[in-house]
Every structure is written in C-alpha cells, then in structure tokens.
C-alpha cells in the first residue's frame, strides 16, 4: 500500500507495546485515523504518548470498534490465532505487521536479517559496519526492528541515501506481505517458538521465509549453506528471481558450485563475487574473548556478505570487525567472582543458542538454565551436556522439565529465584570453573525481558565480589 492511500482511513492497532504505539504515531502523521486497542492494561507512558498524538485507545479488552477499520496493524507478540485477529480475517480486514506498515514509508535501502540465532549480533555488527561507511560517504545507518527500536519510529527520518538494518523475528514476518528488503539474510533455522507454531518446524520456517517472498531482480538473499534446512530450501534446480549468496565455514564445500559465496579458507575470510576471489582478513583478527566461537564466525560472515552487497568498502569492514567485542547478554563475561568465571548469555532463548554457548565454554562448567518454555526438546543436547556440564541449576517455570530432561545425564538442582540460582552455582562449581547463564527459554515468567534478566544476573555477580 502507498502511504497516500492511508489518508483519512481508520486503522486499528492491536497491542500497546513499543511497536504498536509507534505504528499508531506513524499512521497519525500520515493522515490516517488510528485507534489502538489493548487486551491488557496500557502503560502510563504509552497512554501519555497516545494522548499527545491524539490517538484514541481502549484497554482491558477489544470492543466492536476495532472492527470498524480498513486496516489492522498487529503487534508481534499477538498470534494470528487469537480471537480478535481471527475475526479481522473473517471480516476481510487486512492484517499487517508494524514492519510491513513502516516499509511502505521507507525511502532507505533495507537490509533484513532473520534466523533462529545470531540475528542480534549480526544486525549489530552490520549496523556498525554500515555506520562507519556512512561516516565516510555521508549517509546514515539505522538499527531497528526486533533489536528494540520500532521501524516505524525511525522511518520518518530516513532518506534514500540511508541504510536501514532490520533485525526481524518470525513473529514480525508473519504479517508481512509486500515487504521487500534490498538485501535479506537468513542465519539459520532450528526449532524455536514451537509453542506458537503448533510444534511444526515447517510452519516456523515458513514464517522466516517471508523475508524473501517479495524479493526480485536487483535484490540479494544471503543464507547459511551449512544449515541443512536452509540448504534444502534454497538448493533447487530452477533459479530464484534474486541474487543468491551462500556462506559457510569451509570454502571447499561452496566452491563446487557456481555462484557467489563468503567463507573461510586457510584461516582467512574469503569472498567470491562475479567469478573473482578476494581474501578479506584473518579469522584470528576477529575472534576475541567477547566474540568467539563458531557461531560468531557465522555472524561475521553474514555481516561481511551483507555489507559487500550494500557496497561497503573492504577496508571499512576490516576496521570494524577487528574492533568488535560482541554484544551485551551474548556470552558476555559478567565478571570473575569467588574464583569463578561468570558468563551472561541471557539472550540464549532457544536450545540451539544454548548449544552454541556450551560449545564455546570449557568443560566442567555449572549451567544456569530455565525460564518460560517454548516447546523445547532438550534431547538433542544431552550428549553435549554430559560432556561439558558438571551441574545444572534449573530456574523458572521450566525448571522441572529441565530436571526431568537431564536426569541421569548430569546433576540438576532447582532454584526458586535467580539469586538462589547464583548461590547454588557458586556452591557447586569447582575453583577456576565457569558458570554459564544460558537459559534456553524466554524470560517472561520472572523478568520484563531478556535484557532485564541479564542485567539482574550481572548485578548478582557484582554483589558476589
């Protein structure tokens, strides 16, 4: 839809979180007539913003008024299966996401990043690369989306010269229909959010694939060729309508087929584009205590591939990659206390993210895990846990499930709070060992979000010292 088509139209916004309030503001500035409806309570901050914008709203349920609309914008935390959204569909009212809405207004080049793991790190690193290039060439880079800043709040300040780096969750992509990123990145697909997708990895992957549904000539799709689900999806005989760039950790596995790729050979990042190969920099120039492990090498390759597709100079990438120290709450060293190394990996909200953390931390660790379960299957990491973990401290709503899953694999103790978990970890850890806080679950049972969870963990570690 074109922005001018919204003028004078009633648009219902479902959900009063950051993205919902920002979407309402964008609609109001476009001359539409937004109405926001929140099933729960609207926060005082959101209510004040809506009043300032002149946007009417309701809370404590959805009235008939929400259906008196030409368009519905749904917040990412609201499934398509809830009654209000099902009724929207039944009445023929188009339902789109805040990402879709904001994209109608976006003059900037869009780089979209999705996947089960690595989205935030890749988006953060890529944004820093693009921002550094922008300082040289006179454009701005914006970091928006699932990273915490609504796309719709920033899009009014963008120009055609700028780059918008979007971290995109499956929830945000579900209701995207005309969204067309110039460059799309798929980091990996492993089971996650199975509670939302009825236990179907296929349904979850389908939501992720919406990132390239509207891509065409002139666009680029970058994917992890080492991921079996993505490889099966993209390796087909008929050509895709967009440029395809593969990435992987072994150049020899990619060099057997034509096409562009980014990989590693003899300890160096290598890039093949338009038939020629270039060596960018050594891997050991990138890896450091806050940015280590195979998964972060994939994140670096994804960022390099996307930056090259956006026309960023290799020297800009080298400078940013050499100085990048990682992202908060992602295998972040929280401190050394009581003779132990405490690692904050609060962003690990899936089993695969936990697997990556376990592979990066020395054996003999104590693992603190648990939270609100998302349909997790822990059997796939049982052997790795047996090899690497001396004791698990299970917390949150899923603590009993975790205890049952690892019974006979490694000792498990349960904690009623994060503070108790930290104390139990201290008691059960051997001198010099690591304590890894990698929940593999969402945070909403005990915390506001994963950031709140990670900061509370770091505060508890500071108190130990």
From Swiss-Prot:
Record-annotated membrane-spanning stretches: none
Record-annotated disulphide pairs: none
Main location: cytoplasm
Keywords: ATP-binding, Cell cycle, Cell division, Cell shape, Cell wall biogenesis/degradation, Cytoplasm, Ligase, Nucleotide-binding, Peptidoglycan synthesis
Molecular-function annotations in GO: ATP binding; UDP-N-acetylmuramoylalanine-D-glutamate ligase activity
GO cellular component: cytoplasm
Pathway annotation: Cell wall biogenesis; peptidoglycan biosynthesis
Subcellular location: Cytoplasm
Top EC class for this record: ligase
Gene Ontology biological process terms in this record: cell division; cell wall organization; peptidoglycan biosynthetic process; regulation of cell shape
Domain of life: Bacteria
Record-listed E.C. numbers: 6.3.2.9
InterPro entries listed in its UniProt record: Mur-like_cat_sf (IPR036565), Mur_ligase_C (IPR004101), Mur_ligase_C_dom_sf (IPR036615), Mur_ligase_cen (IPR013221), MurD (IPR005762)
Binding site for ATP: 115-121
Biological role stated in the UniProt entry: Cell wall formation. Catalyzes the addition of glutamate to the nucleotide precursor UDP-N-acetylmuramoyl-L-alanine (UMA).
NCBIfam families in the cross-refs: murD
Family: Belongs to the MurCDEF family.
HAMAP family in the record: MurD
PANTHER family per UniProt: UDP-N-ACETYLMURAMOYLALANINE--D-GLUTAMATE LIGASE
Full protein name: UDP-N-acetylmuramoylalanine--D-glutamate ligase
Organism listed in the record: Chlorobaculum tepidum (strain ATCC 49652 / DSM 12025 / NBRC 103806 / TLS) (Chlorobium tepidum)
Gene: murD
